[in-house]
Amino acid sequence: MDAQDIRRAFLDLLAADGHAIVARAPIVLRDDPTTLFTGSGMQPLLPYLLGADHPDGARLADVQPCLRAQDMDEVGDNRHTTFFEMLGNWSLGDYEKAEQIPRLFRFLVDTVGLDPNRIYVSCFIGDPEHGIPRDEESAAIWERLFTERGVSADRIDLDTEEYGNEHGSQGARIAFYGHKNWWSRFGGPDEMPAGDPGGPDSEVFYYFPQVEHDPAFGRYPHQNSDGGQYLEIGNSVFMTYRKTEDGGFAELPRHNVDFGGGLERIAAASIDSPDVYRISLVWPIVQALEEVSGKSYDDYTESMRVVADHVRGAAFLAADGVKPGNSKQGYVMRRLVRRALRFGLDLELTAGVAADLVPVVGRLYADVYPEVAAQEAAIVAVLQKEEKQFARTLRKGLSLLRRLNRQGETVTGAHLFELHDTFGMPLELSLEEAARKEYPLAEDWRESFDTLMQAQQTRSRAAV
């Protein structure tokens, strides 16, 4: 199945199971001061998960476009994107694990066509200190589902990611973790404030035997390792508990279920590819890059991933009315466009890529998110303006870094400030470039940079 078919099939399945298909939220949350973007499917539904009644009932589903700016520096590997779509379904006090887990398993195996022998899961190991039991119910349901398909369902207790890195999952189908399988808005049970809800979760992973485990992420692979063999494709949260004033936990009167599954990752699993950039919603953008650059994805993998992802994300932000700027959503958009331009230079695309790629993005999403295609000319104009403003100064800034390296100089805070102040290069981009090219940084670069920045701000205030 391609990604478009998976999106449609998910909503059809949930609707047939009595879920109301709710309208998606915008990516840009203008009335939420706590966050810049919608970063998960549950985010717009949080008031209802915390107890409010939803006007459409207790069984809900949607597909939510999301943007996570915090993943920007991770883009370039085979699994991270800033923009993605989240398949979501929720029960507000209606059903629990006994309905959620089997339906998810059937969707992945019978609808999407994933091999059950390559599906692995995780469950909550329990927290005796807080009186929270081990999630045997979820594990037992998973064990039954696997056994019915003739798949082994061994268990292993790993508790922490660090322990898993040292010992591996040893082929066990069901791995028990601690904080990795606990959901709350604030982290583990210790970090939660009194009155806040939380609960165990059960993650689903797809195993790629053709990928060699990266030992940089531990000696042995396991479900929650970033070593490359296991790709998380979904997570069911069972919001069951409320933290009490005395630091303990009590059961909520209404148990909720919150499922989120990454469309791009499920689609990658469906074509047996550990690379999410090869799915039907992203690969045409890569192909357009290959055509305009005359270079191949296999030779310029990281650069093409960054450009494809960042232009896609920037196009959706522009469709939501964001323009590049120096604060909040505008700053994130500026970073996306400028990073795309920087990595585009690796492909010898010196004039930017917006005009070539935005129409492709618009066509890919025209059936479900028509606003990109409808505003194509305006979006291209917004992105091209930023590209043109930054292209010349970017080349000069990169030239300065190369010259310093040729002369054997260490990159200092003063150099980084010059790149920021004179050439308009964001500090993050300069640091990233130095790391990519292994240019040495002065030990006191941060202190020096901050001193110069504060002095500039003082001069600016005095001039007003």
Regions found by a protein language model. Give the residues of each.
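Short acidic/histidine-centered micro-motifs embedded in hydrophobic/aromatic stretches
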Residues: 285-288, 310, 357-360, 364, ...
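Cytochrome P450 heme-thiolate monooxygenase catalytic core
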Residues: 349-378
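Structured aminoacyl-transfer and RNA-binding surfaces used for tRNA recognition/handling
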Residues: 1-310, 315-335, 343-353, 358, ...
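Aromatic/basic-lined ligand-recognition segments
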Residues: 340
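Extended, domain-scale alpha-helical bundle/helix-rich regions
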Residues: 344-351, 387-464
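Long, non-coiled-coil amphipathic alpha-helical linker/lever segments
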Residues: 293, 297, 369-387
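Active-site-adjacent structural elements in folded domains
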Residues: 250-253, 297-302, 320-321, 384, ...
